UniProtKB/Swiss-Prot annotation:
CC per GO annotation: cytoplasm
Active site: 116
Native species: Bacillus subtilis (strain 168)
Keywords: ATP-binding, Cytoplasm, Kinase, Magnesium, Metal-binding, Nucleotide metabolism, Nucleotide-binding, Phosphoprotein, Transferase
Family that this chain belongs to: Belongs to the NDK family.
Entry protein name: Nucleoside diphosphate kinase
Name of the gene: ndk
GO aspect biological process, one term: CTP biosynthetic process
Amino acid sequence: MMEKTFIMVKPDGVQRQLIGDILSRFERKGLQLAGAKLMRVTEQMAEKHYAEHQGKPFFGELVEFITSGPVFAMVWEGENVIEVTRQLIGKTNPKEALPGTIRGDYGMFVGKNIIHGSDSLESAEREINIFFKNEELVSYQQLMAGWIY
């Protein structure tokens, strides 16, 4: 079954010019890009995005960081795309992330860990709706799919 997930290169990843490398990793894995945009996250969007952390001591820092500069927001499609992208991304704390993962290769500190990826189908749907309008997403038949799955 084709799933969708939300992936965001955070301000530190954008500033460090990692967008192209990150895109390439997902494309080389065989995932299909359905939408992408460079944007600024508003405070309201950040609060919705991090709603589950509201009331926690680090909530303010999360909102401040994600609104501190441009992000690169993306929607990817593929079979088991959430599981696959989370493996490519690596553990939340870059010190625990394996080499070869995005966070393992580029992350230094848990507060600036380069990238966000949805952790469930429910989260993906909620996050996609925060950052994208339906008409900004394009689903199409990937001609390589037969060679991947």
